[in-house]
């Protein structure tokens, strides 16, 4: 538990201003409303996004939970087991997108 808490805390520092959890292993039987309801116990869910596959009509088994604050995200990350429809979800902080092309970062680099 301490290792996962440390990872969560470190990830929170890198995602300041972006209180978003990335959720994997969402069972195909679960609706986005169930996901929203589950994560609402940790704080206000501003947005719940679960992308669908246009060919199959089913969601892709992953999604994003946008919280109102870093504290709410932290509360969700502290929970060891997130279970919906009997399936344990994999929850982690959303990582910043990789920089592409001409994009730059204001993050200091060690060379």
From Swiss-Prot:
GO terms for cellular component: mitochondrion; nucleus. One of its GO terms (molecular function) is RNA binding. The modification Phosphothreonine is found at residue 104. It is found in: Mitochondrion; Nucleus. The keyword Mitochondrion applies. SMART domains: RRM (SM00360). The modification Phosphoserine is found at residue 105. The keyword Signal does not apply. It comes from the Eukaryota. Residues 19-96 form the RRM domain. InterPro entries: Nucleotide-bd_a/b_plait_sf, RBD_domain_sf, RRM_dom, SLIRP_RRM. Keywords: Mitochondrion, Nucleus, Phosphoprotein, Repressor, RNA-binding, Transcription, Transcription regulation, Transit peptide. Residues 92-111 are annotated as: Disordered. RNA-binding protein that acts as a nuclear receptor corepressor. Probably acts by binding the SRA RNA, and repressing the SRA-mediated nuclear receptor coactivation. Binds the STR7 loop of SRA RNA. Also able to repress glucocorticoid (GR), androgen (AR), thyroid (TR) and VDR-mediated transactivation. This is SRA stem-loop-interacting RNA-binding protein, mitochondrial. It comes from Bos taurus. The gene is SLIRP.
């Amino acid at each position: 538990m301490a290792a996962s808490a440390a990872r969560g805390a470190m990830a929170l520092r890198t995602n300041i201003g972006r209180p978003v959890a990335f959720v994997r292993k969402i069972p195909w039987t679960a609706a986005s409303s169930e996901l929203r309801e589950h994560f609402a116990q940790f704080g206000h869910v501003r947005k719940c996004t679960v992308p669908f596959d246009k060919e199959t009509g089913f969601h892709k088994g992953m999604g994003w939970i946008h919280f109102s604050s870093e504290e709410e995200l932290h509360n969700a990350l502290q929970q060891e087991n997130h279970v919906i429809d009997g399936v344990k979800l994999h929850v982690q902080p959303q990582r910043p997108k990789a920089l592409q092309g001409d994009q730059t970062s204001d993050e200091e680099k060690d060379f």
